[in-house]
């Protein structure tokens, strides 16, 4: 079994880690950073960009730069009305599914495809670090992700060419990282406020056992929402002063969003932030600039409702765990947004404890995922992880009521069976509507899909006995089995609608991604060759200029000939010619370099011989010789 990496696939940033020598190690990306922006872009030349390079060009390429895709993964169009208004790219519908429009390619992407590109980059960068292909991963999801979102995350991994060995909840991963070396039992609350989601989990940790007691959260709350209140404030202030709504201009909106994120981060350590956006727009009177000071107090006032929304899941998680805040030993803060002083103050007020600051909120989830990967690969021993399902699962019964079969915070994996019957005489099939949520009425909960069991022998209503079994695996993903006890007929059922992508669509995307990866690799190689060629042409010019009087005419002519030919190949984009000429010019430069050193050596030898002859003539007696010790220079 090869190395299993742990990946924190975040809304804003992602991170990858691996177990090395029994310790989790965070892997820096190709650009040298330990986290990678979860951003994918396509340029006018149809080149794909992922990570920091994609984020940097977002202002100039708003329609084709995709970020915060995690907020759309596994969701229907009617579930993301607010989120779709907060991004600069166009969110479209395909049936009831979300699609992200890419004008430059004239196509639509599923959110899973965008997430897959981020996963692929992380896996490739990890592969370069490890010196081997990475094909297996543990990927984290918010604890409050429903079945559709978990399945969609697994699909994203598959599209990226990864075998997803386990989907693990982010707070649980953080607890794994925090509690790996803890011997004594501790009750901890993990407060995970990320870029797009918010989770709270209460766990009992100690001596290798990690038991989740409860989990709660809000998948519509995260750092993006805090950015938005700053964006709205900036836009409203500018409109009041200038009469122009910057939110109607995509480029201006993107600049506002980036400035808001920067200000939010600054206000975690400073009491005020200067926001300067020159040339934000223009009128017939000339360019307009935005210049504003945002204080921490004003930001906290703007975000007060969002901060208050963090309170309820904390209280709910404690209630479900049947614990008081006084029974907690530690509060572990996770996610970049947990750095906000107002958020930390809220946690302190609700729990009565100072948050634990010993873990890195941006990396701890990936570290925990790597530990779980180590457990699955057999590298890490004596770890027992007992997680829970975040939401109740059930079926719709007579009168549109949701009847729960598996209640929230049940330890997974788990299996539960219930027996149902027919509603009318002679009924030969039943349709079962599978739901996830906590509301009493079926229509108020998340529909995971419906299935039919046919071939039931006709009988009076209430007589047939149909046993329905819900089975949740260790990933928190549901499968359903139905059995007619009378006929013994049994059927395993895949719930249609549990994922926003069909199996065929996933397979097609896997093939497309593989094809694109090959094309991207070839494109990257061509760029590298061209860069090497341009560098060598420059070096040749510089070397000939500096060593002009030391290089014979014949050698100089050979270098110049190859240099001119290589420069012509660069201008024509002739990569085959570039490859061969690169080697030839390099060889000529080696020859020139060797010749120069030989000349220098010969001159030094001649000079030494002359000095020796002169010294011999001056020598008188050995009495003047001085003994000295020399140390070797290193």
Curated annotation (Swiss-Prot):
Keywords: ATP-binding, Chaperone, Nucleotide-binding, Phosphoprotein, Stress response. It comes from the Bacteria. The keyword Transcription does not apply. InterPro entries: ATPase_NBD, Chaperone_DnaK, Heat_shock_70_CS, HSP70_C_sf, HSP70_peptide-bd_sf, Hsp_70_fam. PROSITE patterns: HSP70_1, HSP70_2, HSP70_3. One of its GO terms (molecular function) is unfolded protein binding. Residues 601-623 have a biased composition (Low complexity). This is Chaperone protein dnaK2. The modification Phosphothreonine is found at residue 197. NCBIfam families: PRK00290.1, PRK05183.1, prok_dnaK. CDD domains: ASKHA_NBD_HSP70_DnaK-like. Acts as a chaperone. Belongs to the heat shock protein 70 family. Residues 624-634 have a biased composition (Acidic residues). Induction: By stress conditions e.g. heat shock. Residues 601-634 are annotated as: Disordered.
């Amino acid at each position: 079994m090869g190395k299993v990496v742990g990946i924190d696939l975040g809304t804003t940033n992602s991170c990858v880690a691996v177990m090395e020598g029994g310790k989790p190690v965070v892997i820096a990306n190709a650009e040298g950073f330990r986290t990678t922006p979860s951003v994918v872009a396509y340029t006018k030349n149809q080149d794909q960009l992922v990570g920091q390079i994609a984020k940097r060009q977002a202002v100039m390429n708003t329609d084709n730069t995709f970020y915060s895709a995690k907020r759309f993964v596994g969701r229907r169009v009617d579930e993301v009305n607010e989120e779709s208004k907060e991004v600069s790219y166009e969110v479209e519908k395909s049936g009831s599914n979300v699609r992200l429009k890419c004008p430059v390619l004239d196509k639509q992407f599923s959110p899973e495809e965008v997430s897959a590109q981020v996963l692929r980059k992380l896996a490739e960068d990890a592969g370069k670090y490890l010196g081997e292909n990475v094909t297996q991963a543990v990927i984290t999801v918010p604890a409050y992700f429903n079945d559709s979102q978990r399945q969609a995350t697994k699909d994203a991994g598959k599209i990226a060419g990864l075998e997803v060995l386990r989907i693990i909840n982010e707070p649980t991963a953080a607890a794994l990282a925090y509690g790996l070396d803890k011997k004594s039992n501790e009750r901890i609350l993990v407060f995970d406020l990320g870029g797009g989601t918010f989770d709270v989990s209460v766990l009992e940790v100690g001596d290798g056992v990690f038991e989740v007691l409860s989990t709660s959260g809000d998948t519509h709350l995260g750092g993006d929402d805090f950015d938005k209140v700053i964006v709205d404030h900036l836009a409203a202030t500018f409109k009041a002063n200038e009469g122009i709504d910057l939110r109607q201009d995509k480029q201006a909106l993107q600049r506002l969003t980036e400035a808001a994120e920067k200000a939010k981060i600054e206000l975690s350590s400073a009491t005020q932030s200067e926001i300067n956006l020159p040339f934000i727009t223009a009128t017939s009177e000339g360019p307009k600039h935005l210049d504003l000071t945002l204080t921490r107090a004003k930001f906290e006032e703007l975000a007060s409702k969002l901060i208050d929304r963090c309170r309820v899941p904390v209280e709910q998680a404690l209630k479900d765990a049947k614990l008081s805040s006084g029974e907690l030993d530690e509060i572990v803060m996770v996610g970049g947004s947990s750095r906000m002083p107002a958020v930390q103050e809220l946690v302190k007020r609700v729990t009565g404890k100072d948050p634990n600051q010993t873990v890195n909120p941006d990396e701890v989830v990936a570290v925990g995922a790597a530990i779980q990967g180590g457990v699955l690969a057999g590298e890490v021993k004596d770890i027992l992880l007992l997680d829970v399902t975040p939401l109740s699962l059930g079926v719709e019964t007579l009168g549109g009521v949701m009847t729960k079969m598996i209640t929230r915070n049940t330890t997974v994996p788990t299996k539960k069976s219930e027996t149902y019957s027919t509603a009318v005489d002679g009924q030969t099939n039943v349709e079962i509507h599978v739901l996830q949520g906590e509301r009493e009425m079926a229509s108020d909960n998340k529909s995971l899909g419906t299935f039919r069991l046919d071939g039931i022998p006709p009988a009076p209503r209430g007589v047939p006995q149909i046993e329905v079994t819900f089975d949740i695996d260790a990933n928190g993903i549901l499968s359903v089995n139905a059995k007619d006890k009378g006929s013994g007929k049994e059927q395993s059922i895949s719930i249609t609608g549990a994922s926003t992508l069909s199996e065929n669509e996933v397979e097609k995307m896997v093939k497309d991604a593989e094809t694109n990866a090959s094309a991207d690799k070839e494109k990257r190689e061509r760029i590298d060759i061209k860069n090497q060629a341009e560098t060598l042409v420059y070096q040749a010019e510089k070397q000939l200029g500096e060593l002009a009087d030391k290089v014979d005419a014949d050698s100089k002519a050979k270098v110049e000939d190859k240099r001119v030919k290589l420069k012509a190949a660069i201008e024509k984009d002739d990569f085959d010619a570039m490859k061969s000429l690169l080697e030839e010019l390099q060889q000529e430069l080696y020859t020139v370099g060797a010749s120069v050193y030989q000349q220098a050596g010969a001159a030094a030898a001649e000079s030494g011989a002359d000095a020796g002859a002169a010294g011999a003539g001056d020598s008188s007696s050995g009495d003047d010789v001085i003994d000295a010790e020399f140390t070797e220079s290193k």
